[in-house]
């Protein structure tokens, strides 16, 4: 059981890294495909239109496609045409062509749509800001005393009690929704009147925390506990040792 993970990274492959596959090998062998490449328009490893019409056509029926890099990496029109004809791909779309003036036609053929917020967690923003702060301090030879952890505010929900008889799937659903109710973003996105509302969604995006901000309680199965820890959640083995940082909620 589990996943067989394939990774395609052409620049790293050229640098000699082992264990990577070509893009076409990955597309041919994968039932779940996650794209999070930057957009580069020139050079040997240009990513613009990387998933072109030919590759879109070649995707196996039932493929789950997560687009979380840049919109122009995928031929979105080819995806739309395939979905209009067959509607046989499971689409999770976070990035779009011509942001912020996007075409909303693909909404009706997607399982989940979000306004380019894959990197919008508070931790992600704070991490980037702290890196700039550290670089400035180093440049001006200033002493840095503040750590990133010391600057992070306490989460609104710090702990979540999981039913002791919950399955792995139930545990994952409860924990993920406890940090990030994904379908609320989807509902806001689908409420757009037109593509021009996209920028407003990003500017008014609510605070979102990462998995590491939430500690899980009550998991009785060691395998599930290890799985959730691997996803980045805090997992309390002994409830007597929990350090309370905020309210405890139970789903």
Explain the meaning of each model-derived region.
Residues 228-230, 237-251:
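C-terminal accessory region of SF2 helicases/translocases
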Residues 2, 34-37, 140:
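Short, well-ordered alpha-helical segments in soluble proteins
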């Amino acid at each position: 059981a589990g996943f067989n993970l394939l990774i395609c990274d052409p620049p790293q492959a050229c640098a000699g890294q082992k264990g990577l596959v070509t893009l076409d090998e990955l597309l041919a062998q994968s039932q779940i495909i996650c794209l999070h490449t930057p957009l580069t328009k020139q050079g040997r490893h240009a990513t613009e239109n990387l998933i072109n019409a030919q590759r879109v056509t070649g995707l196996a029926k039932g493929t789950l496609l997560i687009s979380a890099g840049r919109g122009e990496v995928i031929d979105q029109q080819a995806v739309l045409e395939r979905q209009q004809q067959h509607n046989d791909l499971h689409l999770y779309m976070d990035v779009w062509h011509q942001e912020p003036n996007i075409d909303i036609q693909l909404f009706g053929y997607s399982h989940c749509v979000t306004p380019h917020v894959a990197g919008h967690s508070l931790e992600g923003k704070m991490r980037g800001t702290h890196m700039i702060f550290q670089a400035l301090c180093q440049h001006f030879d200033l002493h840095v005393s503040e750590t990133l952890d010391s600057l992070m505010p306490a989460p609104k929900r710090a702990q979540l009690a999981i039913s002791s008889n919950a399955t792995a799937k139930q545990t994952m659903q409860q924990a993920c929704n406890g940090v990030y109710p994904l379908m609320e973003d989807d509902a806001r996105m689908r409420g757009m009147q037109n593509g021009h509302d996209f920028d407003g969604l990003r500017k008014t995006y609510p605070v979102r925390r990462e998995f590491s901000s939430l500690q899980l309680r009550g998991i009785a199965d060691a395998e599930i506990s290890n799985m959730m820890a691997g996803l980045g959640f805090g997992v309390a083995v002994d409830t007597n040792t929990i350090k309370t940082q905020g309210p405890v909620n139970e789903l």
